[in-house]
Amino acid sequence: MLGLMMDKPLLISSLLDYAAAYHGGTEIVSRTVEGPIHRYTYSDAELRAKKLAKALQALGVGEGDRVATLAWNGYRHYELYYGVSGMGAICHMVNPRLFAGQIAYIMNHAEDTLVFVDLTFVKVLEEIASEVGSVKGFVIMTDEAHM
């Protein structure tokens, strides 16, 4: 690729790499589903997204696999976006405002293999868990105190 405009591929994960390298100390602020404000830096986010990618690989998620998220925007969802796509899988963000039956249909159609869910939507997943055959597991995004 030498002599071209870019000397490396433009990947979604490279956006977070750039932010960590040039704005590593800049704070990212979000409110958690549990209520408190969460603060950390781009460097922290990059590290956690890379750890998430390794954990997904350990769970058997590979390139091209679909990983669904049923979550509000927050730091955990942010890390998923970069961690999942950074390891070559597809981050499938499911609209949490849909009805349970629609969510089940969408997850089946996409053939999602793993679902990350905010506490807010656990009841929805309990309702449809038996209907989403391709899903091998569910990960509830919360801290230990709220399990």
Show which residues each predicted segment covers:
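A detector for short, charged/polar N-terminal pre-domain segments
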Residues: 1-6
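A short N-terminal helical cap/helix-turn-helix that marks the beginning
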Residues: 7-29, 47
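Secondary-structure boundary/capping motif
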Residues: 17-20, 39-41, 48, 52, ...
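Structural core segment of the AMP-binding/adenylate-forming
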Residues: 15, 58-59, 86-147
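Secondary-structure junction/capping motif
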Residues: 10-14, 41, 147
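Conserved AMP-binding/adenylate-forming core of the ANL superfamily
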Residues: 28-74, 78-82, 99-104
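Conserved phosphate-coordination/catalytic loops
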Residues: 10, 43-47, 97, 116-119
